[in-house]
């Protein structure tokens, strides 16, 4: 693969002159890197400086308000630990957002490409840069709201940078607390799920989950339905490693300090930078070998894919003659970066399997559309609903609603998805908010068995209530959007 020329000068911001030209006059687009929030991401070269950049191309029918918010947040940031923003263009029906290029891809990409989880030294080094990025954002009164391995990018030197601000938010004096569910369910803080308002330390919980993800290859609860996960995260004790004995006391304590359920008692980014696990982190040079290995694997797979495409073109005539016996499997055979759904018990080795995790496949950002069978990146958005910014797991609520309606059509006696009285569970059966379960010791065996038997229907009822609350909030927005579209069509 031909290497880009060395940069003539470091690009800091696009000049006014550059911004008045067509983007093709300013950049040479080289290749597609993957899918980001709202659009496709491409690798390109800035002709004047020779610098490699990333360009996100966003269709204008996407939610422009959300895109403008993302650009606004990026534009205000000037930190070596946050992906830089250079400028934007409108080209035909697309908005081009020019950003800093991180050649090694996301931490999630690297884990999948190498089929290996990370060791403690690598995790500590990545976390140190990530915490510096969070410290900067939080000082600027910004919440990222979607911290995970898929949104931590590495450049070829090993410097980690925060990316994908599609759901980030600005804290203001008039809106110091948020009460909307935004993010990806497995990484979400309990207070975010409970919609009781949250602030910057919600990112710290997500960082703790990301630490486990880097160590074990997936976040806690990844093997269960996301709807169940959002019930379990606020009610269960904070998650920890599946095999705590494999990890040092410092690392275990760091994760424990991130995963404190009470946000008022949770450590801040500044405090965590003083934690022994982070203070003893090694320099970024220790990441170079794993980055080189991942990039070599990626290049090899790209070459294999190109070779297979060429072979398919050569054999296309034969395929047409014998179309009933030919089955194309190019995507499957190339083995592009797929999210893994299960982990082997072997030390630090991740094995790829077919999806056993419904449709989430740990997809970072949003679940794929139904017609996509393979995931080729770590930053996917649902192609069927680009207009509305909403958490990924809410797709399951829509499916549950559809399923309930199907039951109504099949059986007129099944009108309620959960046929139970609201008062079937006494108030004292509710899970304590402080997570103190000592009271269970005083219950009889029969009471414990009854409580255990009641948990599933209780959970299903609470999930249904959450779905109904979300639908009640979402429908007026959709109605207003439809009304605006109809008015625009009348012009």
UniProtKB/Swiss-Prot annotation:
EC number of the protein: 2.7.11.1
Query: Has the keyword Transmembrane been applied to this entry?
Result: no
Residues annotated to bind Mg(2+)? 151, 164
**What reaction gets catalysed by this protein?**
L-seryl-[protein] + ATP = O-phospho-L-seryl-[protein] + ADP + H(+); L-threonyl-[protein] + ATP = O-phospho-L-threonyl-[protein] + ADP + H(+)
Could you tell me the keywords of this UniProt record? Acetylation, Apoptosis, ATP-binding, Coiled coil, Cytoplasm, Cytoskeleton, Kinase, Magnesium, Metal-binding, Nucleotide-binding, Nucleus, Phosphoprotein, Serine/threonine-protein kinase, Transferase, Ubl conjugation
- Where's the SARAH domain? 437-484
Q: Where in the cell is it found?
A: Cytoplasm; Nucleus; Cytoplasm, Cytoskeleton, Microtubule organizing center, Centrosome
Q: Where does ATP bind?
A: 33-41, 56
Q: What induces it?
A: Activity increases during mitosis.
Question: Which sequence ranges form a coiled-coil region, renumbered to this chain?
Answer: 287-328, 442-475
Name of the molecule in the record: Serine/threonine-protein kinase 3
Q: Which organism is it from?
A: Homo sapiens
Its ancestry begins with:
Eukaryota, Metazoa, Chordata, Craniata, Vertebrata
Q: Which gene encodes it?
A: STK3
